[in-house]
Amino acid sequence: VLCAAAAFLTMSGCKKAPPGTLTGISISYSGMCYDDTYGFSIRNDPVDGCLFSCNYKDDEWVELENIPVEDTHWQEALALAEKLGLESLPDEKKNSPGLFITDETLVSVCLIYKAPDDEIIYRYLDADGNTRSTLRDFFEDLAGQLQTEGKRGDA
């Protein structure tokens, strides 16, 4: 149950904070990090060694897909994000070609960080038309982390 904890995280929005280790991104249609209607996230889970996406549906988080963390698999994660409609710009107001069907306006992007003291930090970004580049930056950043972490040889 990888996503169970997500439902209990702060629902009041994202606080701005200096970044630590980038561990995930959440796309919201309501301004909250984890939207309880159309929210979903793609996160880097160092414990289970995979990227996963989650959808909040019928009052519970549902895991959609696992992607093993290897040097090139961030590209598959980006492809998954595109499939799920993450790159739809806020002003397009059209049904997602992916799994999330809504005509609501995308209003927030949260980057999820893990600070050196293990605090989880949510950095809120306004979805102002730069959503696509924000997501690409996230995956490029994540790719760099995965390439670095993948060479440590940790079991």
Mark where each language-model region is.
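Short amphipathic beta-strand/extended segments with alternating polar/hydrophobic composition
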Residues: Y38-R43, E63-V69, P116-N130
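Short polybasic amphipathic segments
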Residues: V47-N55, T105-I112
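A short-motif feature that recognizes glycine-rich, charge-decorated loops
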Residues: F52-L89
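N-terminal export/targeting and maturation segments
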Residues: C14-C54, W61, P68
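Generic "edge-of-domain/loop-turn" microfeature
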Residues: M32-Y34, V47-G49, D59, W74, ...
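Sec-dependent bacterial lipoprotein signal peptides
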Residues: V1-S12
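Short, well-ordered, aromatic-rich surface patches in folded extracellular/luminal domains
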Residues: C14-M32, D91-A155
